[in-house]
UniProtKB/Swiss-Prot annotation:
A Pfam family of this chain: Disintegrin
Name of the protein described by the UniProt record: Zinc metalloproteinase-disintegrin salmosin-3
Cofactor: binding comment: Binds 1 zinc ion per subunit.
EC number per UniProt: 3.4.24.-
Originating species: Gloydius brevicauda
Keywords: Cell adhesion impairing toxin, Disulfide bond, Hemostasis impairing toxin, Hydrolase, Metal-binding, Metalloprotease, Platelet aggregation inhibiting toxin, Protease, Secreted, Toxin, Zinc, Zymogen
GO molecular function: metal ion binding; metalloendopeptidase activity; toxin activity
Length: 146
């Protein structure tokens, strides 16, 4: 049994049919909580499998056309700091999603104040059997040495 304080839980086999939890006579309210079991499983997974959360998706994984201003640098964009009114990155031109004049990079563990760190600079310390990850001097992204 996986108790949930709400009328129905996310991932529940059924939705509550109680009138107090419905939007109207012909709809159900959407669950807003995970059951205790789901929450505990999620917490355990984060603790034991958190390494995969560090894997950034590749720009080529996106199948839709690039959209400047969505906070995600896609193919053809040097950076993406969101809409011009929200951009807080001095290295990125929010209107073009390109680097500002004189900038070499806009983000990443190998980027410091809009300048690329030197090749060989440690950007991520060794963990387990994996060696230190080092900057290439060509990108702000810290490559994974596996």
């Amino acid at each position: 049994s996986c108790p949930c304080d709400a009328n129905s839980c996310i991932m529940s086999a059924t939705l509550s049919n109680e009138p107090s939890s419905r939007f109207s006579d012909c709809s159900f309210s959407l669950p807003s909580r995970f059951s205790d079991c789901s929450f505990n499983q999620y917490s355990s997974d984060i603790i034991h499998y958190h390494e995969c959360l560090l894997n950034e998706p590749s720009r080529t994984d996106i199948v839709s056309p690039p959209v400047c201003g969505n906070y995600y640098p896609e193919v053809g964009e040097d950076c993406d700091c969101g809409p011009p009114a929200n951009c807080q990155n001095p290295c990125c031109d929010a209107a073009t999603c390109g680097l500002t004049t004189g900038s070499q990079c806009a983000e990443g563990l190998c980027c410091d104040q809009c300048r690329l760190k030197k090749a060989g600079t440690i950007c991520r310390k060794a963990r387990g059997d994996n060696p230190d990850d080092r900057c290439t001097g060509q990108s702000g992204v810290c490559p994974r040495n596996t």
